[in-house]
């Protein structure tokens, strides 16, 4: 039952992050995008930020939620391995596009309040 509870909390955090980003003007393109096969990656939200260059910026969003601030809180749970998996999934997503737009990797922390970290990490 704990898995179900954890999944429900994760889904609720993603819903809250999605609402927050939509209110900021971003547009949802995909949710829970997964690469095929084992060992791939997943991206919680893929959005487009229409501000800036023509066509906007493609935004790959990782949503993290922790009820307790221990162990670095929600932000402390984004390890280098997790970042590499997100980048791998983003590369897979981009390989399907004819034209690759500007991109960035954001993180939304859902704790007592929502914190949006734009450009939280890069693909390098």
What are these regions (language model features)?
Residues 27-55, 124:
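Active-site metal-binding core of divalent-cation-utilizing nuclease and nuclease-like domains
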């Amino acid at each position: 039952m704990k898995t179900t509870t954890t999944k429900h909390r994760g889904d609720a955090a993603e819903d809250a992050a999605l609402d927050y980003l939509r209110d900021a003007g971003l547009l949802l393109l995909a949710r829970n995008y997964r690469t095929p096969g084992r060992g791939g990656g997943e991206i919680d939200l893929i959005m487009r930020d229409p501000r800036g260059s023509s066509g906007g910026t493609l935004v790959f969003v990782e949503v993290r939620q922790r009820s307790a601030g221990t162990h670095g809180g929600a932000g402390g749970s984004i390890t280098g391995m997790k970042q590499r998996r997100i980048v791998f999934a983003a590369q897979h997503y981009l390989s399907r596009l004819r034209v690759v737009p500007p991109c960035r990797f954001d993180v939304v922390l859902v704790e007592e309040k929502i914190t949006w970290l734009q450009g939280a990490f890069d693909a390098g």
